[in-house]
Amino acid sequence: MINEILDNKMSDIRSSGKNVKLESTTMTSVKDLPSWCFIKSRAMLKGDNKPFVVSVLNSSTETPSKGWKCVLFQTNINDKGQLWQLVDGHLLSQLYGSFVLDIDSDNNNGTDLIINSQIPSNNERQTWKLGSNGEIMNNQTKMFIGVKGSNSAPIDPSNNAQLVCESTTSVDNVCFQWDLEPSFPLNSILTQTTEPFPNYTDEKLKAYIYISNNLIKGIDDIRSQYTNSNYSFNSFSNELVNMKYPDSISKDSFDEIKTQLQSEFEQVDSIINLFNNYQQFHIGLFADNSARLNQIVSIIQFDDKTTSVAGSILSIISNILKLVLTFLPQPAGNFGNVMMGAISVSSAASTPNKVNVDPFKVELSKLWDSLSSNFEAILFNMGTMESMILKDWGKMKAVYQLLSTSLAWTPTMTSQLISTGATAYGISLLQMLLPEKYQIYCWNQNFDAKYGFAPGYPAPIPSDIPEYCTWTDENGDVLFIASTSDLRVHPIKEVMDMVWKDNVVVKKDFYRSRNGWSFPTSLVNRITRWLIPNVTNNTSIPMKYTIGDFKGDSKTTYQLDLPTFSTSYPLDVSHNNNGHNYHFTITITNALDNSKIASLVIIVSAVGGSFSKGQLGDHSVTKGYLIGDPIFNTSVRDSTSTCNIIVNIDYNDTN
């Protein structure tokens, strides 16, 4: 059923009646949604089309920390140090730690670029302004990002060339010119002032009507058919070449209209091809009538189809774009410009075709219904966007000018994008489904020494964890994935093979719940009355949170940093109340200005005598943020109970 709906959707949008006077449409606003991008240099090596981008030195092989240098480097698969997000003037790195682009005031006369922790104030040294000629200016120094040694004249780019913030002697120095890819030009085009098509009178109007009637019998206004998919405007352009002017119309008037329409037909045909390419990608990826979802559900072996599953359309689209940026850097920016344009329009659309970019929670049996309705809405609004462009001369010209650059979509791109997109879509489904059945368990090597328990009291690591289900971090902590009800029951190899396929998923992200993964994490020990609260920051805003106000113990407080797109949890929640029934309060704040984001009371109760489980008590959330239903998992033998609280931006509650 959905295949038929999707196949017909674009043609439904394009169809229009005869002799309809076109009315241009302009969106009053388009929702700007967060997205990762490359900062691509306009400097290229001769004979080498692989772009150079702003990168963090050695970030693909080591774990960077604040103060690490920023360098020029060609795009490198799975290097998070090459992806950035523009947030309130800051250039936020995808690397763990809430790092932003900054200037090293202590080295090279204070011009070297580094990553640094975001300063908790309005510090202009860490904010940047994008110029119209590709320049990126620092708001404090008024200098520009460039390649070291090139301020007087461009030099050949090279890997690991130091990036600086300096002045340049030429505004056209390619070593000081950059492009964000994707750059989302459709957002501004769709909101630009309407520009009508050229209007004609007298002989020119006669020529226009004559040509229209000769191309389509009974049609006096050929432009009214630009959104009609029944016609080939490339064929019309060929017909115009040999069309003779009538005696009743001057040759000059006829030739002027003919030349204008040939130009318009070329633009219409090219724009329709762009949207057809997206349609083919969209249908090729999403119109599987739930086959991919059903396959993953079957492999994970869900027994209860009433299980609640949390999901997000925005996360799916972001994963697709991130993976395309990683594996297909050449067409990625252009693809992202089209796809994110569709999402921006869809999230700003009016019902019933609005896409809800906020997280949702549904029963597993209804997950496909939620996904497919949003996929349909995206495609519908893509058609609406195409129609808006084809009805407006200004928008048509603006889009056409970009078809050879930032909106270029070559014939070979579609199959590559579908293949890479399918991998990302599968990962998104795993991110939704796995936390409903499994959680991460953490065995901390210092736990017994810290608490001074007698030998044998701390729970041992299970001896038979499959290799594909475990990872040891740089501190010696052992993390593994297992059932929420038994730490000795693990996902089957077929499930984990999907996770680790093509090395797309970074193990540290998976086991530490970062960049889209959000498992509850339980500690391996025998204090089963403990509940370990996990908080996931699914935003570009650095946060922190405190755990305190324990029943019977008002003095014990824990404070944790909560970097962007990551999860934090304490390695203990010991307090003076030794019972199984207690409560505590979690307070989440913005790390930059200390404003409160949310406050939640967690109530912990005894289960089965020696175990515990939490539930959500009184809570409040600041306008502009969302906290869905937290996951609460009961403690099991040799491990603590746990919960996971996920903080998201409420995009329906922001401008």
Swiss-Prot record:
InterPro entries: Ca_Up-reg_Membrane_Reg, Ricin_B-like_lectins
Residues annotated as domain Ricin B-type lectin: 40-181
Keywords: Lectin
Disulphide bond pairs: none
SUPFAM superfamilies recorded: Ricin B-like lectins
Keyword Transferase: no
Single GO MF descriptor: carbohydrate binding
Transport found in the keyword field: no
Residues making up the signal peptide according to the UniProt record: none
Similarity section: Belongs to the cup family.
Name this polypeptide is given: Putative calcium up-regulated protein J
Species name: Dictyostelium discoideum
